[in-house]
């Protein structure tokens, strides 16, 4: 039988210091939805005497990955207890991912607080909630037209932020990458005017952390008080003000779209959603905030980790440059050129294999009782998620804890594992983008955007790690990030080809 366990994750943890860790608090709450009905599986991190969950909170924040491993190992024995969230092994990812009876929206609903004013951007069922997936898919189909605009925004950003100076200077990695990602993706989301507007970029880079801060603040109070306290909490007021500001900034762009519909060459998801939503009442500001929440954080995290990995392994820099030069020479920086960059993709994928942003994936809700092919029965109402132990399976990845930038290049040449090599092809060993029918439709955009950015960075700049600023992994609950204070040192160099 596949391994599965019910993982007891404590409610109300608020990590301090920086915004990314706030996501942990929301995920903790999600795992303790009191309305869920879990099957009889082993429970970990639950103590009968821990009435206020103090020990459970500390243990989860410090060692969520170890708790997941413990739960999966316990699942080899007879199921014995009940608790809210069921954690399944990735052996069941195919079955869960392809079954429509496991609902994604309801799987993450406990953290959304969607009935409160200001939190509506995640509201399940509203048009501004249902539109991001088809809008993202539509954007992915325009990648051939978006490659040049993405490159233009990357050039503009690096000239301003990394400068043209030939002297070494320090760059704080995550904040800079977050701003770069926001500007580039906003070119596809809201167009060339707003993508460089500092007012919009401030919203794009802070919305998700502001929302999560507000969620944590509300969750400190009993559920019966939520409809009242949110009106007075400063974080909730800031969130409502940010929603209002987003609408104000988007309205002039919407007016232009109504007067002159955009062609593929100037495609924006804002224009696409406007056409998609004809005849419906919807909030374009909330729709764009939802897209930003989905895209900016995870893409920035992936690019940050990849860039730091490259700096930690400087022997990769020249081969990566040579691959990019060979791919770009003759045809320019096009989708076809990006698809030839197998080493760059391997480095990105190896980084994500070892450093997934979230240790669990595929959060789902069972809308009816489901018996999986291997015999596990999931009762109706169960909240579940998928762990990904296969990413460290030595039978698939020899020496699995070692970073190997060429790992997936070699896998492409191995008939046994060639199907696992493409980064954007989801499978049970690679759940970074989810899996199955509800896999992330924006993964093609994210991978292309990161490749474009890395081409510009590596060809135009010398880069090295600033050793005095620790760049180690920081774990908080389910979230794994690089130290937000990590820095690299850069200086301008002459690129060999024109980008």
UniProtKB/Swiss-Prot annotation:
EC class: oxidoreductase
GO biological process: alkaloid metabolic process; secondary metabolic process
Location relative to the cell: Membrane
One function term, GO molecular function aspect: oxidoreductase activity, acting on paired donors, with incorporation or reduction of molecular oxygen
InterPro entries (UniProt xref): Cyt_P450 (IPR001128), Cyt_P450_E_grp-IV (IPR002403), Cyt_P450_sf (IPR036396)
TM annotation in the entry: 11-31
Keyword Cytoplasm recorded: no
Entry-linked Pfam families: p450
Entry's family note: Belongs to the cytochrome P450 family.
Name of the protein described by the UniProt record: Cytochrome P450 monooxygenase notH'
Organism the protein comes from: Aspergillus versicolor
């Amino acid at each position: 039988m596949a391994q599965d366990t019910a993982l007891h994750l404590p409610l109300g943890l608020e990590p301090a210091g920086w915004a990314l860790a706030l996501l942990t608090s929301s995920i903790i709450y999600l795992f303790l939805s009191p309305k869920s009905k879990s099957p009889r599986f082993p429970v970990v991190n639950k103590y009968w005497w821990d009435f206020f969950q103090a020990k459970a909170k500390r243990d989860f924040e410090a060692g969520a990955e170890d708790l997941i491993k413990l739960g999966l190992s316990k699942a080899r024995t007879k199921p014995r207890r009940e608790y809210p969230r069921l954690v399944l092994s990735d052996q069941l990812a195919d079955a869960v991912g392809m079954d429509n009876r496991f609902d994604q929206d309801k799987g993450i609903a406990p953290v959304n607080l969607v009935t409160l004013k200001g939190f509506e951007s995640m509201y399940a069922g509203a048009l501004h909630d249902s539109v991001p997936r088809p809008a993202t898919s539509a954007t992915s189909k325009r990648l051939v037209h978006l490659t040049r605009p993405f490159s233009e925004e990357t050039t503009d950003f690096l000239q301003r932020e990394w400068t043209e100076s030939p002297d070494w200077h320090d760059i704080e990695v995550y904040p800079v990458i977050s701003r770069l990602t926001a500007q580039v993706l906003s070119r596809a989301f809201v167009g060339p005017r707003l993508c460089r507007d500092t007012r919009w970029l401030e919203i794009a880079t802070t919305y998700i952390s502001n929302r999560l801060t507000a969620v944590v603040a509300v969750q400190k109070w009993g559920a019966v008080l939520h409809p009242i306290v949110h009106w007075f909490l400063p974080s909730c007021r800031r969130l409502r003000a940010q929603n209002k500001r987003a609408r104000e900034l988007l309205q002039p762009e919407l007016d232009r779209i109504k007067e002159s519909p955009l062609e593929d060459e100037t495609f924006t998801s804002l224009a696409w959603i406007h056409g998609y939503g004809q005849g419906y009442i919807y909030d374009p500001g909330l729709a764009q905030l939802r897209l930003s929440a989905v895209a900016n954080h995870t893409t920035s995290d992936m690019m940050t980790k990849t860039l730091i990995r490259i700096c930690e392994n400087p022997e990769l820099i020249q081969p990566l440059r040579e691959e990019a030069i060979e791919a770009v020479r003759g045809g320019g920086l096009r989708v076809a050129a990006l698809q030839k960059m197998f080493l760059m993709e391997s480095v990105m994928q190896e980084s994500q294999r070892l450093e997934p942003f979230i240790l669990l994936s595929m959060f789902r809700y069972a809308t009816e009782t489901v018996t999986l092919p291997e015999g596990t029965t999931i009762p109706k109402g169960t909240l579940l998620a998928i762990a990904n132990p296969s990413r460290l399976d030595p039978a698939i990845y020899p020496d699995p804890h070692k970073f190997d930038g060429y790992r997936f290049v070699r896998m492409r040449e191995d008939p046994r594992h060639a199907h696992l090599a493409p980064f954007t092809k989801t499978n049970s060993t690679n759940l970074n983008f989810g899996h199955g029918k509800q896999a992330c439709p924006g993964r093609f955009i994210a991978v292309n955007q990161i490749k474009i950015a890395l081409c510009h960075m590596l060809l135009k700049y010398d880069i090295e790690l600033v050793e005095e600023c620790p760049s180690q992994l920081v774990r908080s609950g389910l979230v794994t990030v690089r130290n937000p204070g990590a820095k690299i040192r850069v200086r301008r160099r002459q690129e060999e080809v024109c980008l």
